[in-house]
Amino acid sequence: MKAGLLRTQFSYQNTVVREKMKEKTKESVSAVVPIMLIVLLLGFTMAPLSPSILVEFIVGAVLVIIGMVFFSLGAELSMTPMGERVGGSMLRTKKLWMIIAIGFILGVIITVSEPDLQVLAGQVAAVPNMVLILSVAVGVGVFLVVALLRILIGIPLAPLLLVFYAIVFALAMFVPKGFLAVAFDSGGVTTGPMTVPFIMALGVGISSIRNDKHAGNDSFGLVSLCSIGPILAVLILGMVYSTEGNFTTTAITEVSDSVELGKLFLYEIPEYLKEIALSLLPIVVFFGVFQIFAPKMNKKSLMKICVGLVYTYIGLVLFLTGANVGFIPAGNYLGSVLASLSFKWIIVPIGMIIGYFIVKAEPAVYVLMHQVEELTSGSISGKSMQISLSVGVAVSVGLSMIRVLTGVSILYFLIPGYGIALILTLFVPKIFTAIAFDSGGVASGPMTATFLLPLAQGACLAVGGNIVTDAFGVVAMVAMTPLITLQILGVIYRIKDSRRADVPQTVTPVVDMFAELSDDAIIEL
């Protein structure tokens, strides 16, 4: 009888995993296929692609889809429960020094583990790689501590953002132009697929221990504060190091047959196997040590996390291989061809269309959307968030292409953009502010770094611009505009909620995604 019960339980778990896999596959296909169709349409019309680049892109897209499926499922099974457990246990200790120490160490570890940071460090020739990586990691560690203390003390997020961004822009006035775009890019790059699931779950774990009505609001906001640390770190480095250094253009590898194509991808896979293993190892070691001192998990939960880590590992290896080998050359080539046309302005609307769809292919976006839906009981739907993010990224890519064509300083876009975003914090519910500033770091992930940035770099070379000052900054722009669009979503929510309050009690109002909860208590955990 016991054996039969175990078989039934095992069968049920397999069914759940299969259903989850189907759901993740559907999400991944719907996210990547539109990008494939856009690139193919351009390749067969105004921006002809060589057969080599085209086939590399298609194979890369398939790997990206498979990688997204495994990563999304793996993050849900491992990163999220690990983060929630660590966060809850930290608060239960009731020892401030321990919370500060663990928060700082954790911030440094997960930042050094972020694959995108390695890419950024390699592109900043003026600063030694290890110096940049450690500086950014310390920045994230410090601001993760600030974010944790904010949750514990109950400090509103908006005033902190106002103060820290005022410091950021004050420092920016004294930094050479060559460091500005890279500094703001670093804020988006470091909150990538490795960092976001863990940090967000950490916030959920800590806020869940609190019993007050604002605990749910405070589940968000950690990613937004952690994004500030890297910006400040690179700005400070800009005051120490010179801006001298050469930028290396992307090499496009031509393949003549299917054997060479296979070798091209297989040659890169061992590198990413090693890179992702080194990225995951510090987190696994930290959690293992944590398990020794914290109350033990049951074997079933621990096994689930181990399986999730394997899925995460496989997913990130496949995703980064496909994105780096297949997407970077295609993005770079498309940018150079479109910007070389007599009507080069066409790259602005085309960039906006690509930006609208490409954010859906960011792995961490789905982690954020699912967590928002779960914690708000569906009051803020994933679909409304996705549309807001897509519109924001579309606008940011359009503005980035205008920068590439005109050479206008990034500060002329960032200062008004962040100014508008910070002003909006005064008029929207607190949870929308926290989610909006979190989403900026989430939207600017590996797809931005491996397709949108090469697109801008290719266009910049074609028009004879400065790569460092004009092409870099795309990540920063992508991280900025969702702050505005998602808070506009909050304004819409507030208007709809006030209209609902004006409806007489005898009339049953139509309930939509923006009007399911009161304005003062959007979340009750």
PLM region descriptions:
Residues 55-56, 74, 121-133, 150-166, ...:
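Transmembrane helix-loop boundary segments of multi-pass membrane transporters
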Residues 41-55, 75-84, 109-124, 143-154, ...:
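Transmembrane helix-loop junctions in multi-pass membrane proteins
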